[in-house]
């Protein structure tokens, strides 16, 4: 007879605790780990001999400045690279010129996203469907991890020991992700769950001129989140060069003026300007091989 009041009290305690636990899980699921688009960088790897040429051309094209170049180990296994940030009004590049062979899988990650709590961010990414390719490791200024989203999209998350303070962009660049038609939905769901972003548009018949195939169409998904803009291009993989090689699209005020600066600084215009989706776009290759999409609003 004395067991019943005891069981009742346990049930009451559990009923009070369970909603709190559920609330804690929900709060964790809704935590924003991103900081802002100005803290997200495109990772660019060039040969050491091309580093200075790339820096000069990229900054001459977009403006901005470089941080001091350092030589460091930025991988968990032994390696050596020059490292610097190119900070422009339209996007930031993390530039690496490896003096040693590049340890796997470095060089395949597209971007680096600053997060407020790297351990919690990794757990959130895994819960959203990402794999951890390189577990968290220290670097000279913080900690890093390399993850992979459904569809094979590699990304680095990083955290700084000293909180950085960067100026906001004049225009926010777009992370351009090429995926198979079969994996586009899985990637989008996974990334949205992690980033708490939103789909701005989902066009199942976007103009094929945007991927170099004038007579065809493809699916284009535009996403916005605290990490900035992302464009998912779901295709059959039949892409003429250089489509699929670019990782970032940079928005500028005057496309023709920007292309003139690019040419004058040693870059090559691979695709001349074309009009689509209310903007003018072109493709440029900088010294060292980095390919970028550049666009401006149609006038």
Segments and roles (model prediction):
Residues 9-19:
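Bacterial N-terminal signal peptides
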Residues 158-163, 294-299:
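Short beta->alpha transition motifs characteristic of CBS
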Residues 33-36, 43-90, 135-150, 177-229, ...:
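Core segments of cupin and vicinal oxygen chelate
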């Amino acid at each position: 007879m004395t067991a019943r009041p005891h069981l009742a009290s346990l049930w009451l305690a559990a009923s009070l605790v369970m909603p709190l636990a559920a609330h804690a899980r929900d709060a964790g699921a809704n935590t924003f780990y991103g900081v802002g688009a100005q803290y997200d960088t495109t990772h660019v790897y060039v040969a050491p001999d091309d580093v200075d040429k790339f820096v000069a051309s990229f900054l001459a094209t977009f403006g901005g400045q470089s941080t001091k170049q350092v030589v460091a180990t930025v991988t968990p296994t032994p390696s050596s690279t020059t490292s610097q940030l190119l900070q422009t009004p339209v996007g930031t590049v993390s530039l690496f010129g490896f003096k040693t062979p590049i340890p796997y899988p470095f060089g395949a990650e597209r971007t680096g996203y600053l997060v407020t709590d790297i351990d919690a961010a990794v757990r959130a990414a895994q819960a959203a469907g990402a794999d951890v390719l390189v577990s968290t490791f220290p670097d000279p200024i913080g900690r890093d991890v390399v993850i992979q989203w459904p569809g094979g999209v590699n990304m680095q998350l990083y955290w700084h020991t000293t909180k950085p303070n960067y100026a906001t962009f004049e225009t926010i660049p777009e992370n351009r992700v090429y995926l198979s038609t079969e994996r586009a939905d899985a990637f989008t769901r996974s990334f949205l769950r992690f980033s708490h972003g939103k789909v701005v548009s989902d066009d199942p018949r976007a103009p094929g001129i945007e991927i170099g195939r004038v007579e065809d169409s493809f699916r284009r998904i535009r996403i916005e989140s605290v990490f900035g803009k992302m464009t998912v291009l779901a295709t059959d993989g039949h892409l003429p060069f250089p489509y699929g090689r670019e990782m970032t699209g940079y928005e500028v005020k005057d496309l023709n003026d920007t292309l003139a600066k690019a040419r004058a600084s040693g870059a090559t215009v691979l695709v001349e300007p074309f009009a689509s989706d209310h903007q003018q776009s072109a493709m440029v290759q900088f010294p060292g091989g980095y390919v970028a999409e550049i666009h401006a609003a149609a006038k």
